[in-house]
Each structure stands twice: as structure tokens, then as C-alpha cells.
Amino acid sequence: MESIGVVAPHTMHFAEPLRLQSGSVLGNYQLVVETYGELNAVRSNAVLVCHALNASHHVAGVYADDPRSTGWWDNMVGPGKPLDTNRFFVIGVNNLGSCFGSTGPMNIDPATGTPYGARFPVVTVEDWVHAQARVADALGIERFAAVMGGSLGGMQALAWSLLYPERVAHCIDIASTPKLSAQNIAFNEVARSAILSDPDFHGGDYYAHGVKPRRGLRVARMIGHITYLSDDDMAEKFGRALRRADGALDAYNFNFDVEFEVESYLRYQGDKFADYFDANTYLLITRALDYFDPAKAFNGDLSAALAHTKAKYLIASFMTDWRFAPARSREIVKALLDNRRSVSYAEIDAPHGHDAFLLDDARYHNLVRAYYERIAEEVGA
């Protein structure tokens, strides 16, 4: 299928202060947005795609100055793809606190004239949703045909259906969870500790020192990446293969250099991540993950938390995902059924672990495609 082609982001500026869940207030702020497809005359075909930890507004297509800059969900969004931009107007928003253009730690704090750094306020999933709602307002979109996301993006989609029940017709929540387990919070804490203990972190003000806590970022990414893959997938990709030049002896070196292919892969992923991501942003986003728990205000009762939702739901999980296991998606499904909501659930046997939501699996994509066919009929797209 063809790509959507060359795209360009645009920056939206907001002067109305945004009060965050923490009580902090952001005054003037900006959000970077990309759109694909055409909004129909009655504005009924808009779909918001929410991004996960290290992604951004750049959902699909490529940039004119970098043909390798393919959007993070390009296999899902585009002409003739499961989310068909010939039929839907698709919006990607870069969240507050990110490092891809929206207001975040790298931006100048008006109060000091220097980058916010660690002074940037902690943000939550709910804060992101409220900011995204202002984007929708600015675009004249009263109601989304669907809000969709995978992983952390799925949490945002679920939060949309809770916070703005009148503005979401369908919620598509993939490889997600209603709250992080203690194990997941622990993974995030270890990753943050790697960053915080890097001598180049400088309390979050490393910009002024002209350095970056690369070592901490590398380790944080390596930890995270392990949790995104399944054991079977890692065994198939790497096994216990040694990293050796062609013709070299298949024997141990008896040192602490890279010995195994899996070590080489993790170091490569860590180095690549440290090149483009910001450490303060990593801290903010993982804390937002930790804090997401819509049932908390209802004494832990997820069914009560979802009682006022009005959307229809597609919930999907992957059998080999141990980061956000299918049991967590089934918790959402049960809570929705307790409230007699319309919900479709699929548990997909894909070998790639948590990252399966990003990959081109035929059964998964056919599921999403079929669901959007239903939405298209409803909105006349």
C-alpha cells in the first residue's frame, strides 16, 4: 500500500493557562500537530491517534528533508491502510513534556530565561488529554469518530472516554492497561535511577553544561526494550549467538566486551535512543505512566470509574505481551461489560511481545480495518 507521502508538522500556540493535575499552571505553551486526510463537511470523520513513550505527533508519512523519517505508525495509517486517510481525518499531537517540539523541559522557562529542565512540572495522562482537547477545539472538532492508541497511547484513549464522554464515539485501546502493576513501576524506577545517577545529569540542568546523560539514557532504554520483546521473540532473533566476524572462532573472549548478539542489539538500541531523546522527558513520561489509575478516585473500582462512559470500544491485546499482559486488557473489558457498554475484544497470538502493536501483523491489522469499516459506515466516511 502507498504511503501518505510527504507531510509537515505545524505548531499550535495556546495562551489560555492550563492547570495541571499537580496544581501547577502552564501559561503560554505550544503543541506540535500533524494531520492526514481531509476533514469532511460535517466534521464527523476525525480520529485522534495518541502516541506512546518515545513517539510523537509524526504518526505517518515522511518529511521532505529526510526520506527515512517514516512515521511511527505508518503501517497502520495512510491511504488504504487500516486507518484509511482517504476516509478519515487523522490527527497526531505531540504531548506536553516531550522533546519533539511541544512545550517541555528543553523549552525556555519565561520565569528564568533558561530551559525548564527538571523544573518542568510533572504531567499526567489526564493533563495530556485536556491539552489535546484544546487542539480539537482549535480545529473545530466537537466529537471524534475515534480516539486510538497503543500502550501509553491506549491509556490516553481510555482517559478520553472517561474525561470527555460526549466527545468520543469510539475508543480503540491496544496493548494497554488500566494501571501499571508494581513490576512495571519497578522497571520505570530502575530506568529513572540510571538517568538520575548519571554524573552528566546535573540535577536535570545538563543543558547549561553542554552535556547529556547518555549513559543513563542508554541503560534506561535497554531496560525498557527488554520488556517490549517476548522471550520467544528474543530467542528466535538472537538465541545465544555470539557476535563474531565471519570466519572467526566461535569461542568466548573471556572479557566484558560484547560477546552475544543480544548484547550488541541492546547497546545499539540504547545508543540510538540517547542520540534523539531527552532525559528529563523520559523521567516525566515514565512518571505519567506510573500515575495513571482512573479507578483510584473510585476506591479502586474500575467498573465505577467507567460508569459514565458513552463510547463504543475496541480493546486488543497480544498473547506474548508480558509488559501489559492480556489479563490487564480483560480488566478493562470486564469493567465495560459491568456497565453494559458496547465492547469488542481480541486477544491476538503474535510472537513479538508488547511491540506487536507497532508491527504489521495481518490478523491484527485486519481486525482494526474491520472496526474502522464499521465507524466509516456510522459517520458516512
From Swiss-Prot:
Query: Which reactions are catalysed by this chain?
Result: L-homoserine + succinyl-CoA = O-succinyl-L-homoserine + CoA
Q: Which GO terms describe its cellular component?
A: cytoplasm
The feature of type site (Important for acyl-CoA specificity) is located at 323
Top-level EC class: transferase
Q: Where in the cell is it found?
A: Cytoplasm
Q: What is its main location?
A: cytoplasm
Q: Where are the catalytic residues?
A: 151, 321, 354
The UniProt record lists the EC number as 2.3.1.46
Which GO MF term does the entry hold, naming one? homoserine O-succinyltransferase activity
Q: Which domain of life is it from?
A: Bacteria
Every AB hydrolase-1 domain range: 45-360
What are the alphabetically sorted keywords of the record? Acyltransferase, Amino-acid biosynthesis, Cytoplasm, Methionine biosynthesis, Transferase
In which residues is substrate bound? Answer: 221, 355
According to its UniProt entry, one GO biological process term is: methionine biosynthetic process
> Entry's PANTHER family?
HOMOSERINE O-ACETYLTRANSFERASE (PTHR32268:SF11)
The record's similarity note reads: Belongs to the AB hydrolase superfamily. MetX family.
Q: How does it assemble?
A: Homodimer.
Q: What is this protein called?
A: Homoserine O-succinyltransferase
UniProt source species: Burkholderia pseudomallei (strain 1710b)
Lineage, broadest ranks: Bacteria, Pseudomonadati, Pseudomonadota, Betaproteobacteria, Burkholderiales
